[in-house]
Amino acid sequence: MIFITLEHILAHISFSLILVVTLIYWGTLVYRIEGLSSSGGKGMIVTFLCTTGLLINRWLYSGHLPLSNLYESFMFLSWSSSVFHILLEVRSRDDRWLGAITAPSAMLTHGFATLGLPEEMQRSGMLVPALQSHWSMMHVSMILFSYATLLCGSLASIALLVIMSGVNRQVIFGAMDNLFSRAILPNENFYSHEKQKSDLQYTVYFSSTNYRKCQLIKQLDHWSYRAIGLGFSLSTIGTLSGAIWANEAWGSYWSWDPKETWALITWTIFAIYLHTRMNKGWQGEEPAIVASLGFFIVWIRYLGVNLLGIGLHSYGWLEP
């Protein structure tokens, strides 16, 4: 009984904290108040600690990793979003937009788990024999980590598309490189007349108030690429470990279960994104559109099967 009471306390504290942190980060986008952004970062760390305590507490009284039902997977997804934020914050000089993306992600998944799911779905139960496998735990944890990173990366791409509307792509992703080259190679014969005119346009543009917007777009593009690259790797590991586990449990590596089919679709979408970035050299709008599509594909893969209530991966939600 004490474990359940402690879980409820930690769930309410962590949700209240992440709600406040979300409001703080959204506020920093409007008002540049000194110290407000750092308060959001500290709040995210406390939220991470509370959610960690909740998951450990549930692990202790259930006797297994808290990854066995939809409630636990949502809480783990919220925890993963806070981990992702903390890791990126260490390397980011301006975390306002980072927090404005990761904090709402953690809040919405946490809120849906605690407020949106029926109480009977929040209870922990005994694992069936097929789930009592180390491959099972590796598979589920890697997949949920990949969901968190892919969703955050896709949200960064969606934010990029919104901010980038009405801004010339070539100006954003070509200006800095051209100006840098001009500074390093100031030979007058190096540039044609048209090139010099182009550089002048870039210089005028970067002298305007749009400079910060360009910087933000490039930063969002960088975050999206890094997050999706990490999420794609985690998704690959999770899918391969799931195939090994499925072969041990059911004698088949791949059975075209609905979630397996959507896993392949998800993997393909983000493989296309990474291909366009690494081999085609695309930046900005084109790969961001692919990543934005991936955002919806991930949610279909994660919740679509549960809404339908079919397949081996269904948690049974909304089943008659």
UniProtKB/Swiss-Prot annotation:
It comes from Pinus thunbergii. The keyword Lyase does not apply. One of its GO terms (biological process) is cytochrome complex assembly. It is found in: Plastid, Chloroplast thylakoid membrane. The keyword Ubl conjugation does not apply. It is a multi-pass membrane protein. It holds the Pfam family Cytochrom_C_asm. The chain crosses the membrane at residues 9-29, 36-56, 70-90, 97-117, 143-163, 227-247, 254-274, 288-308. GO terms for molecular function: heme binding. Keywords: Chloroplast, Cytochrome c-type biogenesis, Membrane, Plastid, Thylakoid, Transmembrane, Transmembrane helix. The gene is ccsA. Required during biogenesis of c-type cytochromes (cytochrome c6 and cytochrome f) at the step of heme attachment. GO terms for cellular component: chloroplast thylakoid membrane; plasma membrane. This is Cytochrome c biogenesis protein CcsA. May interact with Ccs1. Signal peptide: none annotated. Its main location: plastid. Belongs to the CcmF/CycK/Ccl1/NrfE/CcsA family.
